[in-house]
Curated annotation (Swiss-Prot):
Keyword Repeat carried by entry: no
Feature: compositional bias, Low complexity: 192-215
Protein name: Sporozoite-associated protein
GO cellular component, one term: extracellular region
Annotated keywords: Glycoprotein, Immunity, Inflammatory response, Secreted
Subcellular location: Secreted
Record field: compositional bias (Polar residues): 216-228, 320-332
Superkingdom per UniProt: Eukaryota
Glycosylation sites: 31, 90, 102, 149, 167, 217, 271, 288, 427, 503
Main location (coarse class): secreted
Segments of this protein annotated with the region Disordered: 126-153, 192-231, 303-355
Length: 539
């Protein structure tokens, strides 16, 4: 009730609680106390029962007779003095597992089977384990007054050894050593071999064959294809008995006259006239020269294609094709003053250029020029005017309309540049973002647009276009990932390019000597690897 009063004081502000709930709580507490009292009473009764049970068990242990040993065990012990006929009767009664406990053990069972015993030897008893010692029982007055009426067993004789041969090292062992277990060292160290080596012997003639394992006096048998060699135990024993049984024997296969290589007709020499049209370039590693001479020769080769024809316009064997090609190259030169290094890349590969240094200078060489239809079209560089330099955004839009190729934007000196300040109005940021997107689209390669469907800008037409004031900046799916970069460097590169940084600046911000980038460059194919212009061409 004290607890109930405390509860009432604690929850006094719950005025709407009815009195029935307190009556219910009181009944629950009374039931719990009654259960506790009954549990204590049951524990006391259980302890009394356990004490009575322990006393009864002690009394029963005093009265219980000791279990005598089984008659089979008794017969086993008495079989030491019994004759052989009694042993055989005992064996017939019992099972194999009780007689031979070690039957599953292969080593023990093999020795037991091979051991031939005398008829008087107690074989049956020797294979059995000794009887277990009886547990000491509590002394009782009855045991002292009247002893048990059990027949006394005769004292056991000491057990004889089952294998007495193991102790005597002079005698020959019961199990002979296997034929294949003999080691060469034992044979060499034996006294018989030493005696044989001392006696003078005539040298035996050894067979000439490299792999022959036959004896010298044995006749060489010719192989017969109609008769198969004997297989089975006979052949195995004959191989095992020989001294050189493990050496490989050379197989004599009869050579058939039809398939012999000596009788094959000589094929006519292959006609090489068809292959003379195609010249395969010799790799530079064939010539045994130093690396410095190789590099000099490669420099001569690169200059010879583009400039040698301009220096010698009047060569003896110069054809109309070479003169027209030199004229075409002279016309193109003023338009591209800085493209001299790029000229010999676009020329058709000439395999004869490598051997020009060995020939005399008086001879003229015919170098195949690339046809005009296959040459790359070059668009002259448009230098922006001063008006366009003033407004950078107009210049970027104008270049995007005029040309499709990648252009170089020439910026004025930093003193002439005007500081570009981005206004806070929404329209100025939209123009800046659109210019960035246009510049990134121009850098994109045409091949990546066709092959990669993910590069196509995605337009969601179902939702309709958003209003001009809420247009977000779309992520540049159209930006091509730079070649030779790993995944982490590519993500970092895209992060810098989306911020509006130029490609070169974004490249400079990437970590140097990245191991993953080097691995990616090793496993990537160069862009012009499968270009047919660089493959060997006919003369």
């Amino acid at each position: 009730m004290v607890n109930l009063c405390n509860l009432l004081l604690k929850y006094d502000h719950f005025s709407k609680v009815e009195d029935d709930i307190f009556i219910y709580i009181d009944r629950v507490l009374e039931n719990a106390s009654e259960i506790y009292v009954r549990q204590q009473k049951a524990k006391r009764e259980l302890e009394c029962l356990e004490d009575q049970l322990a006393e009864k068990q002690k009394q029963s242990n005093r009265c219980v007779l000791p279990v005598p040993r089984s008659p089979v065990k008794r017969r086993k012990v008495q079989s030491l003095d019994s004759p052989l006929s009694a042993q055989k009767e005992n064996v017939s009664i019992l099972e194999d597992s009780t007689i031979f406990p070690n039957k599953s053990d292969s080593d023990v069972s093999a020795k037991l089977e091979l051991n031939i015993l005398d008829s008087e030897e107690p074989f049956f008893a020797l294979t059995q384990s000794p009887p277990p010692a009886a547990a000491p029982q509590s002394p009782s007055p009855r045991a002292i007054l009247s002893p048990r009426n059990v027949s006394k067993t005769s004292p056991l004789r000491p057990m004889q050894l089952l294998f007495p041969e193991e102790n005597k090292s002079e005698k020959k062992p019961l199990l002979r050593e296997s034929r294949f277990g003999k080691s060469v060292k034992l044979l060499e160290s034996s006294s018989v071999v030493a005696e044989k080596s001392n006696t003078p012997t005539t040298p035996k003639t050894t067979p000439n064959g490299k792999w022959t394992g036959k004896n010298a006096n044995a006749t060489i048998e010719t192989s017969n294809t109609d008769h198969t060699p004997p297989s089975g135990l006979k052949r195995f024993l004959s191989l095992a008995d020989s001294n050189q049984r493990f050496r490989q024997v050379k197989l004599n296969f009869p050579r058939q006259t039809k398939q012999s290589p000596m009788n094959e007709p000589e094929h006519n020499s292959v006609n090489d006239t068809l292959f003379s049209d195609f010249v395969v370039p010799t790799p530079p590693s064939v010539a045994n020269k130093s690396k410095f001479l190789k590099s000099l020769r490669m420099k001569k080769q690169s200059t010879l294609i583009s400039r040698a024809q301009d220096d010698k316009p009047g060569t003896k064997g110069g054809s109309d094709e070479t003169s027209s090609s030199t004229a075409a190259s002279n016309e193109r030169q003023p338009m591209f003053p800085n493209d001299n290094d790029d000229d010999d890349i676009d020329q058709t590969y000439c395999p004869g250029v490598e051997s020009t240094s060995k020939l005399s200078k008086g001879l003229s060489f015919k170098i195949k020029q690339e046809p005009e239809s296959q040459q790359k079209e070059r668009i002259p560089l448009k230098v922006p005017s001063n008006k366009k330099l003033e407004c950078l955004s107009d210049h970027i839009l104008g270049v995007g309309e005029d040309s499709e190729s990648n252009e170089i934007i020439v910026l004025p000196a930093p003193s002439q540049q005007s500081v570009i300040s981005v206004a806070e109005s929404q329209n100025a940021t939209e123009i800046f973002i659109s210019e960035l997107n246009g510049e990134n689209a121009k850098r994109m390669d045409a091949v990546t647009i066709e092959t990669n469907p993910s590069n196509v800008p995605r337009v969601n037409r179902e939702l309709g276009e958003l209003s001009g004031s809420v247009k977000p900046y779309t992520r540049g799916y159209e930006q091509p990932s730079p070649q030779g970069l790993c995944i982490d460097c590519t993500m970092l590169y895209q992060y810098h390019t989306t911020r509006g940084v130029s490609n070169d600046t974004a490249r400079s911000k990437l970590p140097r000597n990245c191991r993953n980038c080097r691995v990616a460059q090793l496993h990537s194919t160069p862009p012009g690897f499968w270009d047919p212009d660089f493959l060997p061409t006919p003369e």
